[in-house]
């Protein structure tokens, strides 16, 4: 059997026979290694006879050494001569003198053992830990029932009275006997019959029991296997014991736990042989049970067993759990070879697809390639010499390194990798020094700066890996952001400043009004300082169009000529179809950061990535050159404080004094006074800021930096030279005493103190936000990871209706934004002219979207992942364009992960705060990151709004309690009580639809699902998530949020199972539900009934089909317990499962359809 080629993995309970079958021998002694010889003790926990030799090809006693004895079993010490790495895979076992229960199945919630036996966990615990007897066979004793619990005293009395006419026992043995007697088929039938008549709590209990019984019945696991007779001992290399420098030993906690089990087991054996009194044996059995519990899951019951220093020992369960557990530490994230890290510095001389790699680092990373080349070229005659040459860094080595590195891309990664642009490929250029050089334009994608950031380098080894790195990951091919499809490689800071400076105009600059015969002449004049860079001049331009030469005079500045030389002249900013525009410069305005973004966006659309990458590098050169030439820098004298400042402040103080007077005379309330004072100071600050900005010269460096978008903002300028204004106290309430000074003048002590509140809050908030945002991303990835584009078209007829998203009157997302890059689900026809704008299943491009909006369409029916029929994924047509490339999405793209990253990456920018709505009674509305979490976890929101369950007219009654009644024409009516302080959203006599809000607040999505069905809740969640991100100015395409919502809504809760295999109350995937029903209908049986449920992302991630993915996410023990009882099979469909078992992920080039391509030579 090929160990790496399998399609599924199954987990189930191990029977005692199975455990003995795995084992190579019984561990009988608690000894580990001999303290004198340091060799493992025979029959101990590290025994070589059981687990294999500690040294390669060498038995314990030393009779057989060397490879030639391979496979020989030594007649003296019984050790097989083989490789020592078998100690990583050979297992042993311990035969227990008395059976013990497995704590996972007894203690988990709900207790599986308790459910199948119909005993309460408390009674079960009493029996298992020898505190009470359980009746196994009541015989003919009156009033005695099977499974009845007897105390010591009751048992003794009955024993005296009836002798051997009944049987009762305690401990795991008694439970094992009870479990053995269970007939699963019969029990299942009985429970199903009871279910038909049961109601309420009883019904729920029966359903729970039935679930466990069915799990055992279908999986072929026997209930008595939950009780252990034999305990497996894991291979010694997985619980190593190593010698420290001081001659002491460090050992894994597991060895301590195993030793306790063996000690107690041996003692119990001895006591039984001696025929010790029952009470002593009972105590020993209890201790054995507790030792095994601690080994499997320490601390689950009672106090954990502690090691030195009162530290709880790590049990087998702890080895799997949490961030440091096997799953997350070693299986999902491994450290890899051929990697290095170093500090990054800026490399402005690089091309966009290059990075500077320090020589010594490159030599170490490419060592095997260099060695191979050295031998190939005959510089060294064997690999050993080549290795030496490389290690001594001989001079020839460097030339070879240059050769090897050519055309071999490397990957650069900066942690935290929040989206896929956190790892990109570059062609390395060897540099001196020990720092990695990074191109300034890719810093945005990495969120990198040069204040000491470090980055990691990885080398793709195989030819396929190199090809993928070059074509898919090269930085020049990743100019767009996958979250919204906008360019992410846009010049920033100095470059923006340089270009802004370059395109400024200055009235009366040197040489203004001169006329030049050509661009070259004008630039020559500028170089010789005859004209200034910003002077308005005239230039003759000559252009060849359709074979004829057009020439004419254009008004411009030398700076704009320089900029337009690097920018293509047909980007569509100027309408060239008009004769008078033929000679105009493409970019004839002041260029700030926004404009640069537009230019690059157009470049990508018109010219594609390769040409754009070249243009970007040229813009970068210009930007740096002219920000240097312009020598733009900040000094204290640049902060000009407006003269009117004192006057404005005096006026404000007078107004505040008047308001205080009104308050003292009792004409206004304290609250009104406070609000008016605050609004006065805010107005004053704004007025001052306006004055300040008007006052600054347009060549003032601070003004240039802010208005070009290079650095800083209006608000910051106002703090430097205006006034700092109002500050908030730690609880978030505004302090009414403003800070009247600015930083140029300096703050006084009280002002400084007030401003520290906000500063500290900001830092604390940022730290909290980073952690919360990371956890949100992790949950999103986990819920969406198995969504991969699996086919071109799923063939569904359905789509969703989209219209603009509004919040009150404000448009949050326009219709155009929502439909670009999607496929139409119906023909879209212009109502006025009757022409078909776009056919069904055709892509809606920007032009088409504009046409649709111009035709006055208010809503459009488009394909969406929410209605996609593809199982385990989505199809190209429902997904639409891949925003990272601007092309239709490829089959194999892991769109689920991309969606999770798109939503999670801006998480750190969202605020944490809860806004207080005005008034005391108004409830807080959650916003920012907590609101996103609340939506994705489908929680009942804080400050829940009352929604109408029917449509009709509203009547509002105000008696002791406010009530709202909704009536419709069919005579239906519903009445809702309005809690004190809630603000109404409707007026008397208004008409409302089902699902409309009656009071302010957030809607509970579960209610919405009940009232308006799946579509209603989907659009609500989408709009609400978009609102939060748009408030922070973050653009995320709808399709990403839709993918997450799709995952939250893919389950059905069974209400009535009909004649199917399903159980009532089960939550199953829609596909499975439909399959079962189709089967039932085909066989003429009654299909099941169910309703769609909305699961929060954590719950949805845990209820996935794959137990490996769920176990590596959260609640590891619970997931595995459940999976083992059900005998679950993991079909290895998602990404995580495959990463865990070390296969290629089934996405991208790892998909089966790509893996099966074979290249054949043509004859």
Curated annotation (Swiss-Prot):
- For the ligand (Zn(2+) 2), the binding residues are 794, 868, 875, 878
* Entry binding sites for Mg(2+): 449, 451, 453
Q: Write down the Pfam families for this protein, in alphabetical order.
A: RNA_pol_Rpb1_1 (PF04997), RNA_pol_Rpb1_2 (PF00623), RNA_pol_Rpb1_3 (PF04983), RNA_pol_Rpb1_4 (PF05000), RNA_pol_Rpb1_5 (PF04998)
**Gene Ontology CC:** DNA-directed RNA polymerase complex
Q: Name one GO biological process term.
A: DNA-templated transcription
GO terms (molecular function) for this protein are: DNA binding; DNA-directed RNA polymerase activity; magnesium ion binding; zinc ion binding
Q: Known catalysed reaction(s)?
A: RNA(n) + a ribonucleoside 5'-triphosphate = RNA(n+1) + diphosphate
Q: Which UniProt keywords apply?
A: DNA-directed RNA polymerase, Magnesium, Metal-binding, Nucleotidyltransferase, Transcription, Transferase, Zinc
What does the record note about the cofactor? Binds 1 Mg(2+) ion per subunit.
Which EC number applies?
2.7.7.6
Cited CDD domains? RNAP_beta'_C, RNAP_beta'_N
SUPFAM superfamilies in the cross-refs: beta and beta-prime subunits of DNA dependent RNA-polymerase (SSF64484)
Required co-factors = Mg(2+); Zn(2+)
Which InterPro entries did the record assign? DNA-dir_RpoC_beta_prime, DNA-dir_RpoC_beta_prime_bact, RNA_pol_asu, RNA_pol_N, RNA_pol_Rpb1_1, RNA_pol_Rpb1_3, RNA_pol_Rpb1_3_sf, RNA_pol_Rpb1_4
Query: Which positions bind Zn(2+) 1?
Result: 59, 61, 74, 77
Its annotated function is as follows:
DNA-dependent RNA polymerase catalyzes the transcription of DNA into RNA using the four ribonucleoside triphosphates as substrates.
What quaternary arrangement does the UniProt entry report?
The RNAP catalytic core consists of 2 alpha, 1 beta, 1 beta' and 1 omega subunit. When a sigma factor is associated with the core the holoenzyme is formed, which can initiate transcription.
Q: Which family does it belong to?
A: Belongs to the RNA polymerase beta' chain family.
Recorded protein name is DNA-directed RNA polymerase subunit beta'
Q: What is the lineage of its organism?
A: Bacteria, Bacillati, Bacillota, Bacillota incertae sedis, Caldicellulosiruptorales
What gene name is listed for this protein?
rpoC
């Amino acid at each position: 059997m090929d160990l790496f080629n399998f399609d599924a993995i199954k987990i189930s309970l191990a029977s005692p026979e199975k455990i003995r079958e795995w084992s190579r021998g019984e561990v009988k002694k608690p000894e580990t290694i001999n303290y004198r010889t340091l060799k493992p003790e025979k029959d101990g926990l590290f025994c070589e006879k059981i687990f294999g030799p500690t040294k390669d090809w060498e038995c314990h006693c030393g009779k057989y050494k060397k490879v030639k004895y391979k496979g020989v079993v030594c007649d003296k010490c019984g050790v097989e001569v083989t490789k020592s790495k078998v100690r990583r895979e050979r297992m042993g076992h311990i035969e227990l003198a008395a059976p013990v229960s497995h704590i996972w199945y007894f203690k988990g919630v709900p207790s599986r053992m308790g459910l199948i036996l119909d005993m309460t966990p408390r009674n079960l615990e009493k029996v298992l830990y020898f505190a009470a007897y359980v009746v196994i066979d009541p015989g003919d004793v009156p009033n005695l029932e099977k499974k009845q619990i007897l105390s010591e005293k009751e048992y003794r009395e009955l024993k005296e009275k009836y002798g051997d006419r009944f049987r009762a026992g305690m401990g795991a043995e008694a439970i094992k006997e009870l479990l053995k007697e269970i007939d699963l088929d019969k029990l299942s039938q009985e429970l199903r019959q009871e279910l038909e008549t049961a109601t309420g709590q009883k019904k729920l209990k029966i359903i729970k029991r039935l679930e466990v019984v069915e799990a055992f019945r279908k999986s072929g696991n026997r209930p008595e296997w939950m009780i252990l007779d034999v305990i497996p001992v894991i291979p010694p290399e997985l619980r190593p014991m190593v010698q420290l420098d001081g001659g002491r030993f460090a050992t894994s906690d597991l060895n301590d736990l195993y030793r306790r089990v063996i000690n107690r087991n041996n003692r119990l054996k001895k006591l039984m042989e001696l025929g010790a009194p029952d009470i002593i044996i009972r105590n020993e059995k209890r201790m054995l049970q507790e030792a095994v519990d601690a080994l499997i899951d320490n601390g689950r019951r009672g106090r954990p067993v502690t090691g030195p220093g009162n530290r709880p020992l790590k049990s087998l369960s702890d080895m799997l759990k949490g961030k440091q557990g096997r799953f997350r530490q070693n299986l999902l994230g491994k450290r890899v070879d051929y990697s290095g890290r170093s500090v990054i510095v800026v490399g402005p001389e690089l091309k966009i697809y290059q990075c500077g790699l320090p020589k010594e680092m490159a030599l170490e990373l490419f060592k095997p390639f260099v060695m191979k080349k050295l031998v190939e070229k005959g510089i060294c005659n064997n690999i050993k010499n080549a290795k030496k040459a490389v290690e001594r860094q001989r001079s020839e080595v460097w030339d070879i390194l240059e050769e090897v590195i050519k055309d071999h891309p490397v990957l650069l990664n900066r942690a935290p990798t929040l989206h896929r642009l956190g790892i990109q490929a570059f062609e390395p250029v060897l540099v001196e020094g020990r720092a990695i050089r990074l191109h300034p334009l890719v810093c945005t994608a990495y969120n990198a700066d040069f204040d000491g950031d470090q980055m990691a380098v990885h080398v793709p080894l195989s030819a396929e890996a190199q090809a993928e790195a070059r074509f898919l990951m090269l930085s020049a091919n990743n100019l767009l952001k996958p979250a919204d499809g906008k360019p992410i490689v846009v010049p920033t800071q100095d470059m923006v400043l340089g270009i802004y400076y370059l395109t400024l105009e200055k009235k009366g600059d040197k040489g203004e009004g001169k006329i030049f015969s050509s661009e070259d002449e004008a630039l020559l004049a500028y170089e010789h300082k005859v004209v200034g860079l910003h002077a308005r001049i005239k230039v003759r331009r000559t252009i060849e169009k359709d074979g004829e030469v057009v020439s004419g005079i254009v008004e411009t500045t030398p700076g704009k000529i320089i900029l337009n030389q690097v920018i293509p002249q047909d980007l569509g900013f100027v309408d060239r179809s008009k004769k008078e525009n033929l000679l105009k410069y493409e970019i004839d305005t002041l260029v700030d950061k926004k404009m640069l973004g537009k230019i690059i966006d157009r470049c990508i659309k018109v010219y594609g990535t390769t040409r754009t990458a070249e243009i970007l590098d040229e813009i970068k050169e210009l930007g740096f050159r002219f920000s240097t030439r312009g020598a733009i820098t900040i000094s204290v004298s640049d902060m000009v404080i407006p003269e009117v400042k004192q006057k404005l402040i005096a006026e404000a103080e007078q107004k505040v004094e008047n308001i205080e007077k009104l308050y003292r005379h009792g004409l206004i309330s304290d609250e009104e006074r406070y609000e008016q004072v605050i609004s006065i100071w805010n107005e004053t600050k704004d007025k001052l800021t306006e004055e300040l900005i008007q006052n600054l010269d347009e060549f003032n460096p601070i003004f240039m930096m802010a208005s070009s978008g290079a650095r800083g903002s209006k608000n910051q300028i106002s703090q430097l030279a205006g006034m700092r204004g109002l500050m908030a106290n730690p609880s978030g309430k505004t302090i009414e005493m403003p800070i009247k000074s600015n930083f140029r003048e300096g703050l006084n002590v009280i002002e400084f103190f007030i401003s520290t509140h906000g500063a500290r809050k900001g830092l604390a908030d940022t730290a909290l936000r980073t952690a919360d945002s990371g956890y949100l991303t992790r949950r999103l990835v986990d819920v969406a990871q198995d969504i991969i584009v699996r086919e071109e078209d799923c063939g569904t007829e359905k789509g969703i209706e989209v219209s603009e998203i509004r919040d009150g009157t404000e448009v949050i997302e326009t219709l155009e934004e929502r439909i670009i890059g999607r496929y139409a689900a119906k023909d879209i026809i212009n109502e006025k002219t009757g022409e078909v704008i776009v056919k069904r299943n055709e892509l809606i491009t920007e032009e088409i979207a504009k046409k649709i909006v111009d035709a006055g369409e208010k809503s459009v029916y488009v394909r969406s992942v929410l209605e996609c029929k593809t199982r385990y994924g989505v199809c190209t047509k429902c997904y639409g364009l891949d925003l990272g490339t601007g092309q239709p999405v490829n089959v194999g793209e892991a769109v689920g992960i991309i969606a999770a990253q798109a939503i999670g990456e801006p998480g750190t920018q969202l605020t944490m705060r809860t806004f207080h709505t005005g008034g005391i009674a108004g409830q807080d509305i959650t916003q920012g990151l907590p609101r996103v979490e609340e939506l994705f976890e489908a929680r009942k929101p804080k400050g829940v709004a009352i929604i109408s369950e029917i449509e009709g007219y509203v009547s509002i009654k105000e008696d002791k309690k406010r009530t709202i009644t909704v009536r419709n024409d069919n005579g239906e009516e519903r009445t809702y009580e309005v809690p004190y302080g809630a603000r109404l959203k409707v007026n008397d006599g208004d008409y409302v639809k089902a699902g409309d809000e009656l009071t302010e607040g957030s809607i509970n999505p579960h209610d919405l699902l009940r009232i308006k069905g799946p579509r209603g809740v989907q659009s609500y969640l989408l709009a609400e998530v978009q609102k939060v991100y748009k408030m922070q100015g973050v653009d995320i395409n709808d399709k990403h949020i839709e993918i997450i919502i799709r995952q939250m809504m893919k389950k059905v809760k069974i209400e009535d199972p009909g004649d199917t295999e399903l159980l009532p109350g089960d939550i199953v995937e829609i596909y499975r539900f439909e399959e079962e029903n189709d089967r039932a209908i085909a066989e003429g049986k009654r299909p099941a009934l169910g309703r769609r449920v909305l699961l929060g992302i954590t719950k949805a991630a845990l209820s996935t089909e794959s137990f490996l993915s769920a176990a590596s996410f959260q609640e590891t023990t619970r997931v595995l317990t459940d999976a083992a009882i059900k005998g679950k099979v993991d079909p290895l469909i998602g990404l995580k499962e495959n990463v865990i078992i070390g296969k290629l992920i089934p996405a991208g080039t790892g998909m089966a359809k790509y893996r099966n391509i074979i290249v054949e030579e043509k004859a």
